[in-house]
Amino acid sequence: MSNQNNQNNQILKNTNAQILDEFNASIMFDKELYAQDIKGSIAHSKMLASQGILTNEEQKAIEKGLFQVKSEIESGEFKFSLAYEDIHMAVETRLTEIIGEPGKKLHTARSRNDQVCTDFTLYVQDKTLSIKEQLKELVATFVDIASLHTTTLIPGMTHLQHAQPLNFGFHLLAYANMFKRDYERFESSFERNNYSPLGSAALAGTPHNINRELTAQTLGFTAPTLNAMDTVSNRDFALEILFNISTTMMHISRISEELILWSSYEFQFVRMSDQYATTSSIMPQKKNPDVPELLRGKTGRVYGNLISLLTVMKGLPLAYNKDTQEDKEGVFDSVKTVEISISILNEVIKTMIVNVDKMQNACKIGHLTATDLADYLVQKQNMPFRTAYYITKDVVALANSLNKDISELSIDEIRKANDELKNINEDIVLYLDLKNSMNARNSFGGTSTKQTESQIEYFKKWLENK
């Protein structure tokens, strides 16, 4: 009985050890950082050699060995295992197997605390640059399509109700502005976070005679970070990229929502390529906007990753805590999500077919030029705006009774709507014309064709300089 108990206890102990290893290890996800880990280690070894801590021969052996490790990982020859715990130990262990004793010297004047911060910062900076380029391409696509539709009318909406006539190019440029701001957020984050953690060690620096400026320069950073304790505790750079991605995905979700509406039977403003829509499994007549719906849906998981890391960080005492091992998976997931989302949205916009007639006919519903009538009465008749507002309501009521849009009323019909309009000038009809209304909004940033073309020229210059 005693032997049986001992066997059971040993099985339980082994099982618990395996569970603990799986719980504690990060290797199965932080292996994503292998390239940054090796890049940081090469820079660190060069600095150690320049300071006389390593010999030149040792440094060369380390660098050559690290390139071999990188090659083995990329070819699939290297097999990741929980035994390594994390990417740092995996690389160092394999390096030491390849080159022997010099591999054991690589970690001199370094802690995994500053090492992981360096790896993760390099990853975030790399992805910041690549996402920026994707956003630039997306802005260019919106500008290209907008340039084709500076005179195409579309109902401008507030509260999802018809409000005023716009041109479709102007509407698309609203999204170009959103994604331009996203680009600029990534751009400013890159500059703010471009400082090297390497050499901060565990939390207080190192007694070794190191040169942090050299490693910062080698790795492409602006300078070393200023405070070792803050450095190993800091995950602001990860939070920033998560916020930037969340904002970008929010903008992607908004255009996706409009694409879903515009492609519906009720709107029919655009037709998406068959590549980005699917048919129903039971209703053969349907064409479902699956891709925009997925883009809209994926926004939630990205928001979740941001909230998750904010929650991890909110109560951590200085300096390093194991909690921050939970910082990476959400970032990796959000990066991959936004990369594929931008790429797919770009193609959806490029390939959509715009139904110009449907858009322009929709402008004849909802009295989009009612505000123009009120503005006319203020400007031409010197009426107080509130008086003009109520007179315009009478004209709208008349149009409804005649089953017409206000833009379709004749001068005689307008004059019958209210006693104040009995002698109104005939040019009022021109103010109610949809295209004239759109072009009348010629203030800076407005929807007129002239202003829209000016905005397009602005974006073309912006794109040339990026």
UniProtKB/Swiss-Prot annotation:
GO terms, biological process: arginine biosynthetic process via ornithine; L-arginine biosynthetic process
The protein's annotated pathway: Amino-acid biosynthesis; L-arginine biosynthesis; L-arginine from L-ornithine and carbamoyl phosphate: step 3/3
Q: What is its main location?
A: cytoplasm
Location in or out of the cell:
Cytoplasm
Q: Which domain of life is it from?
A: Bacteria
Q: What is its EC number?
A: 4.3.2.1
Keyword set, alphabetical order: Amino-acid biosynthesis, Arginine biosynthesis, Cytoplasm, Lyase
Question: Transmembrane ranges?
Answer: none
Task: Spell out the molecular function terms from Gene Ontology.
Answer: argininosuccinate lyase activity
Q: Which reaction does it catalyse?
A: 2-(N(omega)-L-arginino)succinate = fumarate + L-arginine
GO CC terms for this protein? cytosol
InterPro entries found in the cross-reference section: Arg_succ_lyase_C, Argininosuccinate_lyase, Fumarase/histidase_N, Fumarate_lyase_fam, Fumarate_lyase_N, L-Aspartase-like
Gene3D superfamilies, per the entry? Fumarase/aspartase (C-terminal domain) (1.10.40.30), Fumarase/aspartase (Central domain) (1.20.200.10), Fumarase/aspartase (N-terminal domain) (1.10.275.10)
According to its UniProt record, which protein family does this protein belong to? Answer: Belongs to the lyase 1 family. Argininosuccinate lyase subfamily.
Under HAMAP family, the record lists: Arg_succ_lyase
Per its record, how is this protein called by name?
Argininosuccinate lyase
Question: Which organism is this protein's natural source?
Answer: Aliarcobacter butzleri (strain RM4018) (Arcobacter butzleri)
Q: What is the lineage of its organism?
A: Bacteria, Pseudomonadati, Campylobacterota, Epsilonproteobacteria, Campylobacterales
Q: State the gene name recorded for this protein.
A: argH
